[in-house]
Design a protein with these regions (language model features):
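Active-site cores of enzymes that catalyze phosphoryl transfer or operate on phosphate-rich substrates
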Residues: 241-287
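Secondary-structure "cap/kink" motif recognition
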Residues: 70-79, 284-299, 318-320
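PLD/PLD-like phosphodiesterase catalytic module centered on the HKD motif
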Residues: 2-64, 72, 89-93, 100-216, ...
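Nucleotide-activated donor-dependent transferases that construct or modify glycoconjugates
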Residues: 79-91
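Segments surrounding the PLD/"HKD" phosphodiesterase catalytic module and close analogs
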Residues: 218-246, 387-404
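Long, repeat-rich segments with strong aromatic
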Residues: 302-307
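Extracytoplasmic/luminal low-complexity segments enriched in Pro/Gly and acidic/polar residues
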Residues: 265, 271-278, 286-289, 311-328
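Sec/Tat-exported extracytoplasmic proteins
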Residues: 78, 82, 110, 144, ...
């Protein structure tokens, strides 16, 4: 009897620990974690700002307008990748119908030119991880647009304790089908099932925000998602050979690209600006390298939505100790689409940073329901050209350590 009990315990332990060991060894697919070479590029910086002036809420917004313009002007192809693309929210609040507007424009574009490939990549959060199909994504698909929902099972696990068990014992049942749990994003939307909640709990995502045509490419911190319409954000629109590198980084979502995209050669440009494409862990490498290269008299200006990556926090502190002028503007992390948050991660992380390194100048962006959703760092060096890093990645472990 004791022998049987030991065997049973051993089997249970194996059933627990083998999936965890497997999860610990997962990796992101080939083609991620990219760092291209610097290339000449015609660039334009775009921004969205929401702020209060004389008691009035002011919106200075450029990014969504330029995305629509890029779509309108495309003649040969479009590649689009957005993390949040839905119009689900508490309808007691009021937001512009951005997703509907972009969806209608893409459908019209496809009808106008049926042979032009339009590839649209998004994250399964919009379908609540497979519980249902979001209406706008369904409309795109039904009108001949190639919609790819990122397969998060192919991504590296950030929480092996949970993800190991999920991979071994839950994912095989799928996530489609009705449920009884209220939708977190919209109380009037379809209810979701426990399997989709468990998939959400893996905390994975395709966090990119990219629009590419044969004429220009745009990388942003902004989602077109309706409840994100008033957030403050940054973007860069550019032309040049770096467009090919961005296309290559997006090609990982497709078995085969249409010929118009596969054979695309961007026009060479001559410009005082040089640009490189970086993704996943290479973003951290580039940020870290430039922070470490700063010297007394240099400046670091950081505008950020989430900052909790402990290596970056330490490196910023060490830069301040070297006499680098470090300025940070951060979101208070108190608002999320009508819900009140507790200030995590920024308030505790930056409060501790200020306590340990008093010379760092930290300001909180004053929001009124929206978010300071920016992901932007600017280095002003005394002895070489300035450098900016901006895009879709928050400064968190998941975004910068090859998880998302």
């Amino acid at each position: 009897m004791k022998k049987k009990k030991k065997i049973m315990i051993l089997i249970i332990l194996l059933l627990i620990f083998i999936p965890i060991l497997y999860s610990l060894n997962t990796k992101n697919p080939p083609g991620t974690n990219v760092s291209s070479d610097f290339k000449d590029a015609d660039c334009k910086f775009l921004y969205d700002l929401t702020y209060l002036k004389d008691g009035k809420r002011i919106h200075e917004h450029e990014i969504f307008k330029r995305e629509l313009e890029t779509i309108k002007n495309a003649e040969k192809f479009l590649m689009i990748d957005f993390f949040l693309y839905n119009d689900e929210y508490d309808k007691s609040m009021d937001f512009p119908n951005q997703v509907e507007e972009m969806t209608d424009l893409l459908v019209a574009k496809k009808k106008e030119n049926p042979d032009m490939p339009i590839l649209f990549v998004t994250d399964p959060i919009n379908n609540f991880y497979g519980a249902y199909e979001e209406d706008n994504l369904k409309k795109l698909r039904e009108n001949g647009i190639d919609v790819v929902v990122t397969d998060l099972n192919k991504m590296r696990d950030s929480n092996p304790l949970l993800s190991g068990g999920y991979r071994a014992y839950v994912k095989w049942f799928g996530t489609s089908g009705g449920g009884w749990i209220r939708n977190f994003f919209d109380k009037d939307a379809d209810k979701v099932n426990i399997r989709s909640i468990l998939k959400l709990a893996n905390f994975k995502g395709n966090h990119r925000k990219v629009v590419i045509s044969e004429k220009e490419a745009l990388v942003a911190s902004a989602n077109p998602h309706d409840p994100s319409a008033y957030h403050s954000n940054v973007a860069l629109v550019f032309r040049g050979k770096a467009m090919e590198d961005l296309i290559k980084s997006e090609s990982i979502f497709f078995d085969k690209l249409p010929d118009a995209i596969e054979n695309f050669k961007a026009e060479e440009v001559t410009s005082p600006y040089k640009l490189k494409v970086i993704t996943e862990g290479k973003i951290y490498d580039e940020i870290s390298k430039n922070i470490k290269e700063t010297k007394k008299g240099d400046e670091i200006n950081l505008g950020i939505f989430y900052l909790s990556e402990f290596r970056i926090l330490r490196e910023l502190g060490e830069a301040a100790e070297r006499g680098v002028d470090v300025k940070i503007i951060a979101d208070l992390n108190k608002d999320a689409f009508g819900l009140e948050k507790n200030g995590s991660p920024n308030r505790p992380a930056l409060s501790e940073l200020k306590e340990d390194y008093p010379d760092i100048n930290i300001r909180w962006y004053q929001t009124s329901g929206e978010q300071f959703h920016t992901k932007f760092i600017y280095f002003k060096f005394k002895d070489k050209n300035p450098l900016a890093i901006l895009g879709s990645a928050n400064y968190t472990r998941r975004n910068l350590d090859n998880y998302n």
